[in-house]
Amino acid sequence: MRLFLSLPVLVVVLSMVLEGPAPAQGAPDVSSALDKLKEFGNTLEDKAREVINRIKQSELSAKTR
């Protein structure tokens, strides 16, 4: 029964893979990807700094020292 159900699924998946990318998914713009990566890095850095400062200023860290 499993084989009977898995064969049509396999055929559909193979047809989707062999079809190729859609026209809208053509070549991605490298500069926009780099800009998004840079923006992600900046926001991650800001959030990490906020967390570190919050930990430094918290009473719990002062009590454990």
Curated annotation (Swiss-Prot):
Disulfide bonds: none annotated. The keyword Electron transport does not apply. One of its GO terms (biological process) is very-low-density lipoprotein particle clearance. Belongs to the apolipoprotein C1 family. One of its GO terms (molecular function) is fatty acid binding. InterPro entries: ApoC-1_sf, ApoC-I. It comes from Pongo abelii. Apolipoprotein C-I is present in acidic (APOC1A) and basic (APOC1B) forms in P.paniscus, P.abelii and P.troglodytes and perhaps also in baboons and macaques. The two genes for ApoC-I arose through a duplication process that occurred after the divergence of New World monkeys from the human lineage. In human, the acidic form has become a pseudogene sometime between the divergence of bonobos and chimpanzees from the human lineage and the appearance of the Denisovans. Pseudogenization resulted when the codon for the penultimate amino acid in the signal sequence was changed to a stop codon. Keywords: Lipid transport, Secreted, Signal, Transport. The gene is APOC1B. It comes from the Eukaryota. Its main location: secreted. One of its GO terms (cellular component) is high-density lipoprotein particle. This is Apolipoprotein C-I, basic form. Residues 1-26 form the signal peptide. It is found in: Secreted.
